[in-house]
C-alpha cells in the first residue's frame, strides 16, 4: 500500500527522494542494469563513451517531490486509478473529466513497455466510453499509436523513436488537429515514394490514420471485472494501512527524523553511493587513469573471427538470457501471488466485496442517467445541422462519403482537402475554422450518413453552376490522388457526381426561368411603318 510512500517521505523530512523510483525502474530489467549497459560500453569503447556519460548524467539527476504531491499521485493515480473514471476533484470543486478535453488526445504506447503497456495506456477509453456514439457525443478526438518493442524509457529518449514517431507526430500536428471526433489509429510506415535527396519537403515516412473503434480498443485492453475486484481490494487495504501508519507511526517518525538525518540518508542511497565510491577523488583513480592511457596507446585491433572475441559475445548473451529468465520467473511469481491473494473471498469480504455482489467495483461514468440524457440532447442538436451549410460543407461531406469505405487516410489526402476547401472559407481562413468544419461534418456523417449525403444538393442552392462543376471535378482529382479506387468507392464517387449534377441543374433552372420572363425590346417606328405598308 501507499503507507510506504508516506514512510519514505517522512524519512526525507517531507521530501520524497526520486532515486527510489529510479532504483525500482532499474530492478525491472536486471539484465540491462547489471550487465548489458556496462558490457555495451566496453565492447564499443571507441564510440560509446560520450553517449554513456551523457545518459548517466541525465539518469543520475534524481529529482525530489514534496510529500503531499507524491502521496496524492500514488493514492489517486497509481492505486486508486481515479483519473480514468472522473473521480478526481480540484481544490475549488471542479471535476477532472477527460471527456471534457476538446483538443485531440494522442496516446503513444509500446508492447515492450512493462510499466505502461497498451492495455493500461488505453484502458481509460473503455472506462469512460461505452461505444463510439459516446465519443462522438462528447466531440472528442483520440489518436493512438503502438510500437512493437521499445521500452518505457525509450518512448521518451530513444533516438530511433525520436527520428520516427516523435518527428511524425510533430510534422502532422495540423492533420491530427483537424481529425473528426472519434477514435483513430495512427500507423507510420516507410514512404512508398523514393526520397529525393536535397529536397527538404521529402519525407522518409508516410503517416496513415485510419478510423478505429471502441471495440478495437477493447480488444487491446481486454477489461476483466475480476481483475477490477482485485485492484479494488488493494485500494481499500492501502487506505487502511495508510490510516494506521498516519495514526500510530507517522507522529514518531516525524519527531525522530531531522533535516540533517534526512541529508545523510539521501547521500547513503545505493544509487548515489555508486557515484561517490568511485570518482576522481578515489585514491586509486590516478593509477587507473595512467593504466587506461597505456592501454589506449598500445591497443591492437582483432579480427571478428577471433575465437576469444566470439566467446566474449557468447558469454555476454548467456548472462543476459540468464538474468532475463530470472526476471520473467520473478514477475510471474509476483503476478500469481497477487492474483491468488486478492482473489480470496475472505480478503475481498474484508474490503467490502461480497461473493454475489454484481455491482461493478469501479464507477462507470458512461452508464449514469445524467450521461445518457446529455448524450441524447447532443445528438438531437446535431440532427438540426444536417440541412445547414454551403459549398465547403458539401465538399467535406462528399469526400467523407467516398473515402468512408477505405477507413483510412494519409497526409496527402488532408493536404488536398485543405487546398480544395480553402477558397470557399473566405480570406480569413485559419486551421481552427477548417478543423471545426471537418469535425462537425464528420459528426453528422456518423449520425445519419444517408440523410447527410442526400442533403448535399440543398447546400448548393446559392452556388453558381460553373463553380459547382469546377468543385465536382476537383473532388474526383482529390479522391484519386494516391490510390486506385475500389468498386465501392467508384460507385460512391458516381453517386456524389450525380448529386452535384443535380445541384447544377437546379442552379441553372432559375437562370433559364429568369431569361424567359425578360420582356422583348420595343419595336422601332421604322418597323411599324413597314408593317403598315
Residue map of PLM features:
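Small-residue-enriched hydrophobic alpha-helices in membranes
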Residues: 356-533
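Conserved alpha/beta-hydrolase "acid-adjacent" motif
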Residues: 115-120
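Extended non-globular C-terminal regions
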Residues: 250-388, 393
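Short beta-strand/loop motif that positions the catalytic acidic residue
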Residues: 101, 107-109, 113
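Alpha/beta-hydrolase-fold enzymes
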Residues: 1-68, 182, 197-299, 303, ...
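A catalytic-pocket lid/entrance helix-loop region that shapes and gates access to the active site
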Residues: 1-31, 134-136, 140-141, 146-149, ...
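Catalytic active-site module of serine/aspartate enzymes centered on a nucleophile-bearing elbow/loop
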Residues: 133-233, 326-330, 334, 338, ...
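Mobile cap/lid helix-loop segments that gate and shape the active-site cleft of serine hydrolases
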Residues: 59-95
Amino acid at each position: 500500500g501507499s503507507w510506504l510512500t508516506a514512510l519514505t517521505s517522512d524519512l526525507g523530512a517531507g521530501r520524497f527522494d526520486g532515486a527510489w523510483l529510479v532504483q525500482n525502474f532499474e530492478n525491472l530489467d536486471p539484465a540491462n542494469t547489471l550487465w548489458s549497459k556496462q558490457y555495451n560500453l566496453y565492447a564499443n569503447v571507441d564510440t560509446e563513451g560520450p553517449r554513456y556519460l551523457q545518459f548517466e548524467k541525465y539518469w543520475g539527476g534524481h529529482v525530489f517531490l514534496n510529500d503531499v504531491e507524491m502521496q496524492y499521485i500514488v493514492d489517486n493515480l497509481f492505486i486508486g486509478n481515479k483519473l480514468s473514471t472522473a473521480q478526481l476533484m480540484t481544490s475549488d470543486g471542479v471535476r477532472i473529466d477527460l471527456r471534457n478535453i476538446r483538443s485531440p488526445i494522442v496516446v503513444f504506447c509500446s508492447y515492450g513497455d512493462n510499466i505502461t503497456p497498451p492495455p493500461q495506456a488505453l484502458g481509460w477509453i473503455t472506462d469512460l466510453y461505452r461505444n463510439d456514439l459516446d465519443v462522438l457525443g462528447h466531440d472528442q478526438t483520440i489518436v493512438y499509436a503502438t510500437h512493437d518493442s521499445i521500452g518505457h524509457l525509450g518512448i521518451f529518449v530513444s533516438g530511433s523513436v525520436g527520428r520516427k514517431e516523435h518527428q511524425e507526430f510533430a510534422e502532422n500536428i495540423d492533420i491530427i488537429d483537424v481529425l473528426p471526433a472519434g477514435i483513430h489509429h495512427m500507423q507510420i510506415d516507410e514512404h512508398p515514394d523514393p526520397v529525393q535527396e536535397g529536397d527538404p519537403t521529402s519525407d522518409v515516412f508516410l503517416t496513415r490514420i485510419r478510423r478505429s473503434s471502441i471495440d478495437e480498443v477493447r480488444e487491446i485492453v481486454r477489461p476483466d471485472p475480476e481483475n477490477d475486484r482485485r485492484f479494488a481490494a488493494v485500494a481499500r487495504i492501502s487506505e487502511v494501512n495508510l490510516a494506521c501508519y498516519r495514526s500510530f507511526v507517522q507522529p514518531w517518525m516525524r519527531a525522530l527524523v531531522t533535516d540533517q538525518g534526512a541529508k545523510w540518508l539521501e547521500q547513503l542511497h545505493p544509487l548515489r553511493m555508486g557515484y561517490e565510491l568511485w570518482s576522481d577523488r578515489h585514491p586509486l583513480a590516478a593509477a587507473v587513469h595512467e593504466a587506461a592511457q597505456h592501454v589506449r596507446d598500445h591497443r591492437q585491433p582483432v579480427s571478428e573471427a577471433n575465437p576469444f572475441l566470439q566467446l566474449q559475445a557468447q558469454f555476454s548473451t548467456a548472462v543476459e538470457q540468464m538474468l532475463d529468465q530470472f526476471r520473467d520467473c520473478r514477475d510471474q511469481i509476483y503476478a500469481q501471488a497477487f492474483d491468488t491473494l486478492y482473489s480470496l473471498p475472505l480478503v475481498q469480504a474484508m474490503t467490502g466485496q461480497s461473493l454475489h455482489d454484481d455491482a461493478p467495483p469501479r464507477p462507470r461514468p458512461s452508464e449514469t442517467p445524467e450521461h445518457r440524457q446529455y448524450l441524447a440532447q447532443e445528438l438531437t442538436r446535431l440532427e438540426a445541422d444536417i440541412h445547414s451549410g454551403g459549398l465547403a460543407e458539401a465538399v467535406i461531406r462528399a469526400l467523407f462519403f467516398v473515402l468512408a469505405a477505405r477507413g483510412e487516410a494519409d497526409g496527402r489526402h488532408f493536404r488536398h482537402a485543405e487546398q480544395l476547401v480553402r477558397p470557399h472559407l473566405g480570406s480569413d481562413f485559419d486551421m481552427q475554422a477548417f478543423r471545426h468544419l471537418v469535425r462537425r461534418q464528420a459528426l453528422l456523417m456518423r449520425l445519419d450518413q444517408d440523410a447527410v449525403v442526400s442533403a448535399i444538393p440543398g447546400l448548393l442552392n446559392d452556388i453558381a453552376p460553373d463553380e459547382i462543376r469546377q468543385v465536382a471535378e476537383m473532388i474526383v482529382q482529390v479522391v484519386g490522388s494516391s490510390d486506385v479506387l475500389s468498386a465501392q468507392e467508384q460507385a460512391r464517387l458516381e453517386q456524389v457526381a450525380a448529386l452535384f449534377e443535380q445541384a447544377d441543374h437546379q442552379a441553372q433552372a432559375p437562370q433559364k426561368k429568369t431569361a424567359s420572363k425578360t420582356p422583348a425590346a420595343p419595336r422601332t417606328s421604322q418597323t411599324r411603318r413597314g408593317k403598315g405598308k
